[in-house]
Each structure stands twice: as structure tokens, then as C-alpha cells.
Amino acid sequence: ILVNVLIGLGLLVLLALTFAPLESLGWWAREGADEAAATVQELAAIDSGPDDSAYDGYVVYLSGIGAVGGDSVPPEELPLIQNLSSRLTRLKVIHDVFPYSVSNNGLTAQRPTAAVWRWVEKLRFKNPETLAGMLINARNAMQLFVCADRRYGPAYNVGTAQEVMRALRRHGYPMGSGLPVTLIGWSGGAQISIGAA
């Protein structure tokens, strides 16, 4: 029985790895290529503008593989974000980008599998050591593999970079000001920040 369970788990992992790039490839085919071209044109047209920001720079934080959405930071990461915000008072710390989706669409947000991910998240809150909670980590790790893949990574990284830019705008970043932007991340978020840069 143990051998059958291990074979079944292996097949599930293989199947999940096979489907992992589909979100970013679907996004690229539907809208990503057009959005990327428009963004390049928009950025080329921006003149240096006045620095009318209340901050000396911006820090965009990308969560680790335990995240379920941009609006939900894993509890173990909160002290780091709070520490950054309290110590770097002249910098705006942004932490509402979900790095494991090219469209910043959290697992529990508007997607066909949202109910499943809400159930898994509820189990994880009740018992952080539950095997079901590891499904979130596994799913996000597979997106991390997509980010690092030479075939699918470029599309994934463009999508993430666009979401970072949208977050900067939402938080008042003056485009064309030349204010520094620093990307940092926890665990897989650090890897994805390299691709988005």
C-alpha cells in the first residue's frame, strides 16, 4: 500500500509540474504580450518628473512560498515587514504583491480553485504542521520553478514586474522621478524578485 501511495503522490507531483506553466502562458497569450508592449511604450514616453513623493525610496517585499495572496502575509514574515517599516521610515514598504501569480491573483481570490485553497488555508491555521498546508508551499514552489525556467520564465517575470509596477503606482510612486526601488523577498519571493528586476 505504501508503494502505491508513493507512486500516486509522484504522479500527482508530475501532473502538477506539467500544468504549472499554464497560468503564466495563458496570461501571456490573452493579455501579457500586449500589456508588456504598452508598458514599454509608456515607460519610454515618461519624462523625468519632479520628486513629489513623501519618501526617499520604495521597498517592494515579495512573500515566501507560504503566501496565499498579496493581501495575506504569512505570520512568520510579519515581524520582518514590521521591522522594515519601523526602521526605514523614509522608505515606503509595499507588501501587497502575490509573487506566485503573474496577475497578482491570490489563491483564495477569484479563481476556479479558490474554495479548495480557502479550505486548505483554514486547515493550516488550525494546525500549521498539517500536510494539507504543505500543498500551498508545493503549489507556490512549482510557480517558482516556472519563474526560473528558461522557456517560461521570461513571460512569468514580465508579469511579475508589471504587478510590481502597478503596486508602486497604487502606493504613490512618482514615475520618472528616479527614486530608488528595492525588491526584497522571503524564500521564493527573493528568487522571483530577481526575475522581476
Region spans (language model):
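N-terminal membrane-anchoring alpha-helices
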Residues: 1-43
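Active-site catalytic motif of lipid deacylating hydrolases and related acyltransferases
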Residues: 27-28, 61-68, 77-176
